[in-house]
């Protein structure tokens, strides 16, 4: 199997949803083959952001990132967005050439917006296409709601766990929704 068939999965945790106001606080990446088998796991990086930004998070982010321990990891981190971008690019470059893989994940359009704003070199590494599991979820919800019942997620809102959830969710749809 060609490395060109590999898929890059990325998840970001942010201080909110608006890239004009909010920032990235955690990122992780996984590379799979075309059959969704994990080939390699990239660095899981808590990205330092100032307390002033963390204090402005809405209630959901404050509660969720506080309960998971992410807020504390962000405060203790010394890694900048630029360093996180570089570490991730170095990892990806060991496994694929730029432009080979779409950006894969759940609601990945949101992650791409933050990458464009804060990590443009990383965003440029991906093919312009997206492989968005949430699109398949929306189709299943409309056409085969019974398929959704088998989807199991950790829901921790930690980047690496969320990627694993997305890969497992797509496996479920492949096995129960698509006729291959």
Curated annotation (Swiss-Prot):
Keywords: Cytoplasm, Exonuclease, Hydrolase, Nuclease. Residues 7-170 form the Exonuclease domain. Pfam families: RNase_T. Its EC number is 3.1.15.-. The active site is at 128. Belongs to the oligoribonuclease family. This is Oligoribonuclease. The gene is orn.
């Amino acid at each position: 199997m060609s490395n060109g068939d590999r898929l890059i999965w990325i998840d970001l945790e942010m201080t909110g949803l608006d890239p004009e106001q909010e920032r990235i606080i955690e990122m992780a990446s996984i590379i799979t083959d075309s059959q969704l088998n994990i080939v390699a796991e990239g660095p899981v990086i808590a990205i330092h952001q100032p307390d002033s930004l963390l204090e402005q998070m809405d209630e959901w982010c404050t509660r969720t990132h506080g309960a998971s321990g992410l807020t504390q990891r962000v405060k203790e981190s010394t890694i900048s967005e630029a360093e996180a971008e570089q570490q991730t690019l170095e990892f990806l470059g060991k496994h694929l050439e730029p432009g080979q893989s779409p950006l894969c994940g759940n609601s990945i359009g949101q992650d791409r917006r933050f990458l464009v704003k804060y990590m443009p070199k990383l965003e440029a590494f991906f093919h312009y296409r997206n492989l968005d599991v949430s699109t398949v979820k929306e189709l299943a919800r409309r056409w085969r709601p019974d398929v959704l019942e088998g989807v199991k997620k950790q829901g921790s809102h930690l980047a690496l766990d969320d990627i694993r959830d997305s890969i497992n969710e797509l496996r479920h749809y492949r096995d129960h929704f698509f006729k291959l």
